[in-house]
């Protein structure tokens, strides 16, 4: 089982605040996510600028595309994104369109599982050639006190068994990682637990150490 990668979510409102994070921890993570908030706040230039600064890192545009899959994904890939996200409620043809464009750029598409989705949809994504999904405990759910539970673990295992590369996100803290031990997680996303730590560098390194201990 390969080691899960570590992704930092830049859900900053401005590039200036995003740079405060990347200056510290870009070299400590595998993937730099231009979060949805930053995508809205700064547009695709955020993707272009971060990829220019860190060409050796995977840069994800968390655009959560809901429609116009080809147009919006092309905007992201032309800004040098490596991966883009499509929201789970999007029509299957939106996901297919985004994937078609991704292939032109040797990129990839992730289906963002935020909100309601079905196993029938999951099979449609697999049949369409989608390889990646993001299992997401929403920001608002976290704020309401919703914790990771057995239903989450069961769903993540099932997605993995279907052949998906599964990314896990949603207010992850270091203490959550053992919950997922034994599952071939593709990526763990940490946002505020790294960005807002007293020492973001040490927080990122602790995540990497824990991943190596649990999956090594």
From Swiss-Prot:
> Cofactor(s) for this protein?
Mg(2+)
Binding, Mg(2+): 33, 62
- Note the Gene3D superfamilies from the entry: Aldolase class I (3.20.20.70)
Query: Per the UniProt record, which EC number(s) apply here?
Result: 4.1.1.85
Q: List the disulfide bonds.
A: none
Reaction(s) the record says it catalyses: 3-dehydro-L-gulonate 6-phosphate + H(+) = L-xylulose 5-phosphate + CO2
GO biological process annotation, one example? L-ascorbic acid catabolic process
Keyword check for Oxidoreductase, yes or no. Answer: no
Where along this sequence does the record place binding of substrate? 11, 192
Q: What induces it?
A: Induced by L-ascorbate. Repressed by UlaR.
A molecular function (GO) term:
3-dehydro-L-gulonate-6-phosphate decarboxylase activity
Whether Cytoplasm counts among this entry's keywords is no
Entry keywords, A to Z? Carbohydrate metabolism, Decarboxylase, Lyase, Magnesium, Metal-binding
Co-factor binding comment: Binds 1 Mg(2+) ion per subunit.
Spell out the residues of the site Transition state stabilizer.
Answer: 64, 67
Query: Pfam families annotated for this entry?
Result: OMPdecase
Metabolic or biological pathway: Cofactor degradation; L-ascorbate degradation; D-xylulose 5-phosphate from L-ascorbate: step 2/4
How this chain assembles, per its entry, is:
Homodimer.
Q: What does this protein do?
A: Catalyzes the decarboxylation of 3-keto-L-gulonate-6-P into L-xylulose-5-P. Is involved in the anaerobic L-ascorbate utilization.
In the record, the note on similarity to other proteins reads: Belongs to the HPS/KGPDC family. KGPDC subfamily.
Q: In its UniProt entry, what is this protein called? A: 3-keto-L-gulonate-6-phosphate decarboxylase UlaD
Gene encoding the protein: ulaD
């Amino acid at each position: 089982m390969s080691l899960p990668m570590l992704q930092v979510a830049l859900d900053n409102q401005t590039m200036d605040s995003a740079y405060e994070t990347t200056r510290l921890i870009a070299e400590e993570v595998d993937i730099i996510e231009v979060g949805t908030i930053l995508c809205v706040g700064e547009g695709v230039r955020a993707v272009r600028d971060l990829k220019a600064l860190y060409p050796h890192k995977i840069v994800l545009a968390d655009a959560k595309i809901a429609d116009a899959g080809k147009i919006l994904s092309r905007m992201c890939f032309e800004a040098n994104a490596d991966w883009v996200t499509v929201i789970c409620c999007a029509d299957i043809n939106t996901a297919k369109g985004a994937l078609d464009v991704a292939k032109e750029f040797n990129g990839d598409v992730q289906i963002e599982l935020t909100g309601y989705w079905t196993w029938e949809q999951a099979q449609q994504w697999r049949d369409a050639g989608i390889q990646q999904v993001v299992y997401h405990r929403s920001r608002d759910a976290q704020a309401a006190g919703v914790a990771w539970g057995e239903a989450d673990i069961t769903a993540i295992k099932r997605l993995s068994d279907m052949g998906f590369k599964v990314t896990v996100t949603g207010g992850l803290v270091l203490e959550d990682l053992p919950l997922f031990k034994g599952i071939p997680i593709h990526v763990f996303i940490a946002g505020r637990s790294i960005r807002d730590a007293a020492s973001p560098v040490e927080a990122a390194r602790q995540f990497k150490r824990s991943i190596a201990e649990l999956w090594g």
